[in-house]
């Protein structure tokens, strides 16, 4: 039963971190979308936002089944992201700047999610698969952003 408790605790924590990461990603995309000039870049980010949101719905269901309502990104992380985004775009409002900011965000997301996968080893298969799907969405976006850097 100790193992079962650890598994459900790890499952819950991993899903909460995925939920937080999705909210951070969607918020970041919303924040830069008004600064994008290239239609293809706009479409790339919009498609990624839809993928994040769709997976977010699945995560909400998984969390609800565990009696949890999710996790918002930390105020410090959100504030630092907002400041970095607005300062950089204030200095150079270009698609290259947007792509650079989003690339940094993807890198941080992939690194954090991978760390959480390693940390919450007891999480069940479904939640681990969800985290890997989210990493895949981030990796796809990262790859799509490269031509704009």
Label the model's feature ranges.
Residues 58-110:
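Carboxylate-rich helix-loop segments that flank metal/cofactor sites and access channels
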Residues 1-7:
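Short, Lys/Arg-enriched N-terminal segments with co-localized hydrophobic residues
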Residues 30, 34-37, 41, 64, ...:
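Short, flexible helix-adjacent loops and helix caps
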Residues 26, 56, 60-63, 84-87, ...:
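A structural signal for well-ordered alpha-helices, especially hydrophobic packing surfaces
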Residues 42-76, 145-148:
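Conserved alpha-helical segments that form or flank metal/cofactor-binding pockets of metalloenzymes
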Residues 7-36, 97-121:
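Alpha-helical bundle segments that constitute or directly flank the non-heme di-iron/ferroxidase center
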Residues 10-18, 39-54, 95-101, 126-137:
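Alpha-helical scaffold segments that form or flank carboxylate-/histidine-based iron centers
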């Amino acid at each position: 039963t100790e193992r079962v408790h650890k598994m459900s605790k790890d499952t819950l924590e991993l899903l909460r971190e995925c939920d937080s990461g999705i909210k951070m990603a969607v918020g970041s995309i919303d924040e830069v979308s008004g600064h994008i000039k290239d239609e293809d870049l706009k479409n790339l980010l919009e498609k990624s936002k839809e993928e994040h949101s769709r997976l977010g719905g699945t995560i909400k269901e998984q969390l609800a089944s565990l009696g949890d309502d999710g996790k918002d990104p930390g105020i410090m992380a959100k504030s630092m992201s907002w400041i970095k985004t607005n300062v950089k775009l204030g200095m150079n409002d270009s698609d290259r700047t947007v792509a650079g900011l989003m690339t940094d965000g993807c890198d941080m997301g992939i690194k954090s999610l991978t760390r959480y996968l390693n940390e919450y080893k007891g999480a069940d298969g479904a939640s681990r698969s969800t985290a890997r799907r989210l990493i895949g969405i981030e990796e796809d976006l990262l790859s799509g952003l490269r031509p704009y850097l």
